[in-house]
Amino acid sequence: MAEFETTFADLGLKAPILEALNDLGYEKPSPIQAECIPHLLNGRDVLGMAQTGSGKTAAFSLPLLQNLDPELKAPQILVLAPTRELAVQVAEAMTDFSKHMRGVNVVALYGGQRYDVQLRALRQGPQIVVGTPGRLLDHLKRGTLDLSKLSGLVLDEADEMLRMGFIEDVETIMAQIPEGHQTALFSATMPEAIRRITRRFMKEPQEVRIQSSVTTRPDISQSYWTVWGMRKNEALVRFLEAEDFDAAIIFVRTKNATLEVAEALERNGYNSAALNGDMNQALREQTLERLKDGRLDILIATDVAARGLDVERISLVVNYDIPMDSESYVHRIGRTGRAGRAGRALLFVENRERRLLRNIERTMKLTIPEVELPNAELLGKRRLEKFAAKVQQQLESSDLDQYRALLSKIQPTAEGEELDLETLAAALLKMAQGERTLIVPPDAPMRPKREFRDRDDRGPRDRNDRGPRGDREDRPRRERRDVGDMQLYRIEVGRDDGVEVRHIVGAIANEGDISSRYIGNIKLFASHSTIELPKGMPGEVLQHFTRTRILNKPMNMQLLGDAQPHTGGERRGGGRGFSGERREGGRNFSGERREGGRGDGRRFSGERREGRAPRRDDSTGRRRFGGDA
């Protein structure tokens, strides 16, 4: 086993890669990196058995990048990943690792992204292709992905691909790759199906086994909340209000998210600030100093920006965006519980991210308990307790006499009416409560939360499981929302831009988290379109839609007024009626939540989805590969 004192330079990596590692803050290789990099540099096949979060992305990326030819504009490295989230993460990492290698391009291919975007990226001759099995196989069948020059193949999280039912696609892809290439396979477990692949496709692989060293301290209380019933920003405010903390750090994935979350917290009265890579060193140090001395209570940061952060005051860590690997999670929550203090760590998990939660639990060898969203009753109780504590503090002050003298000068509104001190106290209480009212309206009833289950628990499903159509005709149809509850909006994309109704529905449903059954009539014109949406759209949602892009053009959504009645047979955009494209996903503006996505796992375009893509447009700042999604 390699010693931790080994440096990346000792492993034989060249200057451009070492420079990139230095820029990224890498100091010394992890055990799996120290073991795998020399073998891969020497052209050996490698079979790596390590948990997520062990640093395996760098373990295979660095040596394969060093061995490729930047002058050859053809795919030389192919990485297979089980989900689009992991594919994007690996593509981002390989882009960072190769940033000082001139002429090296990376493209990510996954379901849900338009084919024309991916075809444009492939025509540019990327040397590195990262993708999900289904979409990669589609490109191979279409003849749009040429692997004749491939020199390196990586199967990342092979056991996860087996669990998700992709292993046949993986074998089909591997059978089409020319001989003479190098293969690296990484898996946390080694079931027989994976062993069969190693025997069939790998040449005397060097086995590398790394036991997880990821641990967490018992003085950090951990829990997770399944994102359900309201937006993450709204839920974050509730959790912060329900928690007792000295200072908190909130981790997000992108630089833009640090600013957006900080703005949301400032609007709700929290003293917060963003910390991201765009800040110069002087501003960064100033922000951290404010956090240390108590002038700042909440910091919103990315993983990179928070490296080296050590502030004893931090007693709460919120993983607003779940990290993609277990090691990052441990590093994040390690920011709390310093100097012998107890710490709290909260993790937000969306249903599509349950695999990442399972990886964290498996690596850390513990089960993280789930918590419920603080309800209105709890918030009201907390607010009253805090207010009562402030009142008690004032009751103990020594300068109340001069204020007591003012009571006699406050006259009742009606002549002859005596001043009722209890009523006066109630009026002053109402005035003093501030923006957070002491009386919290009860929560609106929500639909029951879906079970938080793995795909394995549901078992396989095909068309024959659904029963004959005649057996399903008694199901009640959902009622269409009355037009009187709708408003008409204009968006600046139209037929001349190549937009179709499905593009608009997808953008509104996904970016606004709105059920498509709450989307009304859509009409396409040459240079613009109109769309009906429920009344009461929050300003922040409209602002988000203004920046959201469809076919790489901003929507610039504007309210035109109330929707006008129209005939029930009217079709949207001159095409298929909306009833043929509905799905039970999203929510309306009143906060009603959906029952889930489309059961067949397909987008409005009919393309297969291999796991929902992370939301991304120019307003979120998510990095893109090969064009717009």
From Swiss-Prot:
Organism annotation: Escherichia coli O157:H7
Annotated localization: Cytoplasm
BP GO terms, sorted: cellular response to cold; ribosomal large subunit assembly; RNA catabolic process
Functional summary from the UniProt entry: DEAD-box RNA helicase involved in various cellular processes at low temperature, including ribosome biogenesis, mRNA degradation and translation initiation.
Alphabetical list of InterPro entries matching this protein: Cold-shock_DEAD_Abox_C (IPR021046), CsdA_RRM (IPR034415), DbpA/CsdA_RNA-bd_dom (IPR005580), DEAD/DEAH_box_helicase_dom (IPR011545), DEAD_box_RNA_helicases (IPR050547), DEAD_helicase_DeaD (IPR028618), Helicase_ATP-bd (IPR014001), Helicase_C-like (IPR001650)
CDD domains: DEADc, RRM_EcCsdA_like, SF2_C_DEAD
Pfam assignment, any one: DEAD
Superkingdom, natural source: Bacteria
Motif mapping: Q motif: 6-34
Positions bound to ATP: 50-57
Example GO molecular function: RNA strand annealing activity
Name of the molecule in the record: ATP-dependent RNA helicase DeaD
Gene: deaD
